Amino acid sequence: MAVLRVPVSWLLEYVHTQTGFVGETGIRSDTRRTHTDCPVAEDILESLLSVGFEGEILDRPELSGPIVVGRVLDFTEEVHSNGKTIRWCKVRVCAPVQPNNTPLSKDCNPSTQTGNFSNADTNSALETRDIVCGASNFSKGDLVVVTLPGSNLPGGFHVTARKVYGHLSDGMIASEKELGVGDNHDGILRLAEVFQGDELSKIREGDNALDLLALTDSAVAVSITPDRGYAMSIRGIAREYALANNIPFSDPLPDDVLPAGGLSIDLRCKPNAFFTLLIQEIENNQTPQWMVRRLQLAGIRSVCPVVDITNYVMVETGQPLHAYDYDAIQGSLCVRTADKKETLDTIDGRRLELHTDDLVVADANGVLSLAGVIGGSRSRVTSDTKRILLEAGNFNPIDISLSSRRHKLYTEASARFARSVDILIAQRALARAAELIRDLASGDITELGSAYINYTQQSPILLSTLDIERVVGCCFTREEIMSSLRAIGCDVSCDSDHSTPDTQVMLVTPPSFRADLVNVQDLAEEVIRVIGFNRIPSLRLSVPHREQPLQSQQYKLENGKLENGYTLSPVTPPRTPPVTFEQRRLLGQSLAACGHVEVICYPFVNLAAAGICHIDVTHNPDSTHNPDSGSDPIIPTGVTRITEPGSSGVSGPGNVGVKEKCSADTSIEHAPTTRAISLHNPIDATEGYLRRSLIPGLLQCAHRNLSRGLCDLSIFEIGRVFLGQLRTSNLIGCNSDSTCNACSRKNTIESMNEVYQPYTVSVLQTGSAIQKQPYTEGRKYDLADVFDSARQIARGLGVDFHFVQDKHPAFHPGRCAKVICKHHHIGYTGQILPTLANKHNLPDNVFACEINLDLVAQLGCSQEIVKTLPTSPAATQHLTLTLGNNIAAASVISVVKEGAGELLEDIRLIDEYKHEESDKKSLTFAMRFRDKEKTLTAQRVNLAKENAVRLASSKFGAIMRR
């Protein structure tokens, strides 16, 4: 999102702010706040926000008090013992006046007086003041800026009369930096350096320097979204401000355009518009202070009058201009694409190796500028330039955006062209620049060199009152709709041929500067933006109490309308059911409530990070797990292990499309073993790949926090990962036309070669889980904490996870488990490999988990289930089983659950004891039984427990200890 810096005084030149004025449109007259003759920055931001533009105050005036023009009458140089040379000056200024119009005595303390310090009275008597100054860049008779006692400077500096170097200094002669108008602090500000000729001769001693140097102006920063390029100018923002307050807008552009001339331009690549103008006999000496100050507030540095004028017109109108030194051009200009291996030395000192798709402006000797982006040094305008060729073009936004990103050049011009500039404004902006050059640089306008424009008016859009009602959700009259659209510049007429008694139809033709208005939805957005968002009624949505997951339909519809009469626009469902925004939001809130901190990382990584942390299950969503396998299971049929190119392993890029069998004996064609997706134009050349896991970003985030002393971290991220192109027809299940009984559902991908971009959630923990306090022992994060984090994710999604020991190249061997949900492998959890953690300057004990949310959603989340609280009591018993060391506890829990049946509400492992003299171990579980309908009896609990023991004995040879 681009930011436009808007000086307040500049904006108010183009709008009328008289109190009580009512605009021609009459829109929102009851809701608009009336401003005074001089609205402050807060008023402007409030008005712009009401029409959809956010902003903030950037430059607020920090100068106040008696800051006036003084003349240096005489000075005496003194060298002090510390080696510093100072000047003891006599400066003639105007004395500040008190309310009774009597001069304020120099002997009085200004801080205790009530005199008018904000503006000097030019009719007051002149007086001479003694001032100590450390600068030496001025002479007798120079006009300077004097800050008298009682004035305030930027940074909270309060000027008082005080003794300096043995003299009482009755004020201060200010520098550029002290006044906030520049960075020069070596010498004081001489007005002869700022003003020349008639402007300088009109300045009198005692004049208010704040008004003279425009130091009371403030600026606001307005955020411009990519679709609102028409607002990327003072003219555009002024139009929106006038719209927000029902006041007239004064267009600064001249209506008269320049006549066509005879200069020849070779347009091999046709732009949307291209105009040039030859101007001679330029006096390129000094830019007037009012323009320098406005450009400074707009964030642009002053260069020379011609360049400043082109920048000024660009900020004012939104049309970028470029000035060429006409004497540096050889032959005629040509607009073409760059040749192979052609280069351009830019005005900022860089050398660009141009691409054959780059649009350039060239002459007989080569490229002069990268069109719409930046100019070249060979034809740059300097203070010695006498003849210029002024260019105003309009180019394809996509071409300019690609060139800008290709060369990593983001200029004021490219920011505007990439957002689309009004084609019809080019010639008027050129005339405006010519007018300023003639007035400020004595330029002689010779002729309009070339005039080319290719503009086709947008086709009218058919709009009805029912269209607005359907999109917005509330009704407006035809008069309101027509009035609001005319207010933004649209041509609106009634279409009686398509109108009916119930539906009023209009033909709407957007203005040339609103290329973003292309359909009914765009027009509806403008209508509600102009009329007011407060006209949209509030609707309360509630989650009904139910035991089953909510279906996709959440509203009761009757004849295509909601119960309250508002229509609901049809939404095309996605091809596959990924995790929804609401599910992700609730999961994030759940994790944050548990003490985790959410972070957002860039999706760009280097190749090493993309490979080592790839969670391979995410591209194998058909992977299943058999809970009855006993010992630590091998990856089941249907899962392809990923290996990086060049590494050894059974699978890899050469094993794409291997067919295996799922448990239902249905054929599955795997997704290809994915490699990292590279970016053609990365922001950082060292991170030119899309992430395949969230863990690399969390490791970098942890490193940044640890380097700043934040050592105890529990962070998480919810975001997409990018796993290459899919060739499989299913996300879960098989290729059968009917629903696979083993997989329980069918989800077909309709198109081939799609990039699989599942949402995943990842948690990373390191440091202290509990800080040491009085009566409380501290504790570091350990493996149990990250398993608890995975369980928190499960609770947030309304599902159950269990864990099976496994291996993964990013995790510590023996301290890694894969996460299973409904017999499907959906992620990993464990301790990060210490060597990987150390590469990020992290301690050895770093724990993480990563879960594929899209897979969980397809398996069936139940976030919105509201369960009834139990009314019957629970019965708790312990169970200790002795079995082999190689049997995983998760497998035992799964079997015990199956054997105990529905009465078993919860089971968890509370103790493990390994026998030293045998290969046996004892596992102790806490079991909670409950019947939802009635009170349990001891006989039923014992029977359920015996059934569980019997099944565990048959599966694993387990023996219950009594």
From Swiss-Prot:
What residues does Mg(2+) bind to? D516, D522, E525, E526
Query: Catalysed reaction(s)?
Result: tRNA(Phe) + L-phenylalanine + ATP = L-phenylalanyl-tRNA(Phe) + AMP + diphosphate + H(+)
Gene Ontology terms describing biological process: phenylalanyl-tRNA aminoacylation
Region span, Insert? 621-675
UniProtKB keywords: Aminoacyl-tRNA synthetase, ATP-binding, Cytoplasm, Ligase, Magnesium, Metal-binding, Nucleotide-binding, Protein biosynthesis, RNA-binding, tRNA-binding
| Pfam families found in the cross-reference section | B3_4, B5, FDX-ACB, tRNA_synthFbeta
* Family to which this protein belongs: Belongs to the phenylalanyl-tRNA synthetase beta subunit family. Type 1 subfamily.
Protein name, UniProt field: Phenylalanine--tRNA ligase beta subunit
Which lineage do the record's taxonomy fields give for this organism? Answer: Bacteria, Bacillati, Actinomycetota, Actinomycetes, Micrococcales
